[in-house]
Swiss-Prot record:
Site positions (Important for substrate specificity): 192
InterPro entries given in the database record: Class_I_gatase-like (IPR029062), HST_MetA (IPR005697), MetA_family (IPR033752)
Record-linked Pfam families: HTS
Species whose genome carries this gene: Escherichia coli O139:H28 (strain E24377A / ETEC)
GO annotation, biological process: L-methionine biosynthetic process from homoserine via O-succinyl-L-homoserine and cystathionine
Positions annotated as active site in the UniProt record: 142, 235, 237
Designated name of the protein: Homoserine O-succinyltransferase
GO molecular function, one term: homoserine O-acetyltransferase activity
Protein family (similarity comment): Belongs to the MetA family.
Residues the record lists as binding substrate: 163, 192, 249
Statement: the UniProt record of this protein carries the keyword Thylakoid: no
Gene Ontology cellular-component annotations: cytoplasm
Length: 309
């Protein structure tokens, strides 16, 4: 789906240089079809970088996707220009009366912060409660998975003693599931988290279906049977260099991080890493858009059916 974004958004030129199809609002207005409305709640500090990563994955299907960027943290950003936020982001009050086909909630570097200490925790709870009646399907990524499991299922925060960082092998558990359609039997995806997601925890305390897990038995991809919510505990949106940037940042901060697993050639941080997960990431987001959003959402969003009966 060509993503439909404002003409002036920096991601337009960035993604076009990568041969990614981006449709600006001015061009899209000439096509007489209803685009899918997808809201992205961007919780990452480097918002422009995160926009590029997610928009890249939303760009590869034949229908238009109308992107709306949402922020819920009113504090001044140290990593994103205020002008960019003012021009391209909306506040929750701006969209709370609207309905959306899809919602993506990104990760956030909050793995060691207790939920109640997160500055915008009440706002996250508000958005998730709102989404039950206003969004067809929501996709949670990394830290957002942990937050959603707590809010929706009451599961306490599970934290690892060491950070999981690297590119890990996964295997699918339900090859005929719509969200894993076309996946290889085993595939690679990046992780960068303190959050812990043992598959047994998901099975014991939720009715969610685990669709793929790591070789160590951690849940990677799981979803509700009605397709209203889906969870991915890794970072399939990451660029080739993202884990390297995080690693060298932590080295400079004196944190003594472990070298990301299965990432640098020959395990040497001086070597340039290569992305080995792009096809997986693209297929995951295409499947979500098609089977969890497009095939289910009503043509007229005014007639949203929250229960999907």
């Amino acid at each position: 789906m060509p993503i439909r974004v404002p003409d002036e958004l920096p991601a337009v030129n960035f993604l076009r240089e990568e041969n990614v199809f981006v449709m600006t609002t001015s061009r899209a207005s000439g096509q007489e079809i209803r685009p899918l409305k997808v809201l992205i709640l961007n919780l990452m500090p480097k918002k422009i970088e995160t926009e590029n990563q997610f928009l890249r994955l939303l760009s590869n299907s034949p229908l238009q996707v109308d992107i709306q960027l949402l922020r819920i943290d009113s504090r001044e950003s140290r990593n994103t220009p205020a002008e960019h936020l003012n021009n391209f982001y909306c506040n929750f009050e701006d969209i709370q009366e609207q309905n959306f086909d899809g919602l993506i909630v990104t990760g956030a570097p909050l793995g060691l912060v207790e939920f109640n200490d997160v500055a915008y925790w009440p706002q996250i709870k508000q958005v998730l409660e709102w989404s039950k009646d206003h969004v067809t399907s929501t996709l949670f990524v990394c830290w957002a998975v942990q937050a959603a499991l707590n809010i929706l299922y009451g599961i306490p925060k599970q934290t690892r003693t060491d950070k999981l960082s690297g590119v890990y092998e996964h295997h699918i558990l339900h090859p005929h599931a719509l969200l894993t359609r076309g996946f290889d039997d085993s595939f690679l995806a990046p992780h960068s988290r303190y959050a812990d997601f043992p598959a047994a925890l998901i099975r014991d305390y939720t009715d969610l279906e685990i669709l793929a897990e790591t070789e160590e038995g951690d849940a990677y991809l799981f979803a509700s049977k009605d397709k209203r919510i889906a969870f991915v505990t890794g970072h399939p949106e990451y660029d080739a260099q993202t884990l390297a940037q995080e690693y060298f940042r932590d080295v400079e901060a004196g944190l003594g991080p472990e070298v990301p697993y299965n990432y640098f050639p020959h395990n040497d941080p001086q070597n340039t890493p290569r992305a080995s997960w792009r096809s997986h990431g693209n297929l995951l987001f295409t499947n979500w858009l098609n089977y969890y959003v497009y095939q289910i959402t009503p043509y007229d969003l005014r007639h949203m059916n929250p229960t999907l009966d």
